Amino acid sequence: MDRMIDAGGYGICLFSANTLQEFLKREKIRKKKVLSLLQKNDSLYLLTQKEGVLVPLPQIDDENYAIKLAGQDEPFDDKWERKINYEGFNLEIKDGLWITDIDQLEPFEQLEYHAEKAEFYTTPPFGLEHYRSPQERWYKTLNEHIVYTAIKYDVPAGKYLLSIQGYVRKKSLENPTPNCGFFFSLTAVDTFEGFKNPREADDYDFNITSMK
């Protein structure tokens, strides 16, 4: 079964938890609402892109997306059609790669990314069942659907250039089966030379659900 992320926050984000935590500590940022901060402070956001702190895929529809990483997952097969192909986003990994719903930065709960064991728990007011482990987080809706909010891949520490391909299923299936997905690949580099900004709407469009 494909790994997946539900983009309830209308975006997906890729980062290494320790890279982000060390950046926040160095910049003396104590606010947990990292997403709001980066939306308001453009110079700080651009610094995250220059240093490879995180890569957001903004302004995408609230959908369930299949997630694949080159070298660890099988590529999308001929039942899918590629819609986008972007390359060259800086990303520094120190303790594995997290791929999350972008709302997981609002707030960014650092301890959630260092769980040592699997754990089920519930949250008020509806008593929704949640699950967290060293490799993934999800919760169950009132309709018993599982919504994945964060998944982790074990990736060696280092600096990488991230490539992003977006795919759409040629023949749609019923929800919650994903009909769109992203295939990510990482190319190791010694240093970052310049950077690309995925929030530049004129250059990048990640909303593959509109390309069916």
Give the location of each predicted region.
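Extracellular structured ligand-interaction cores
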Residues: 150, 159-161, 181
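Arginine-glycine-biased low-complexity disordered regions
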Residues: 134-136
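A glycine-anchored, Pro-Gly-centered beta-turn/N-cap motif
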Residues: 155-168
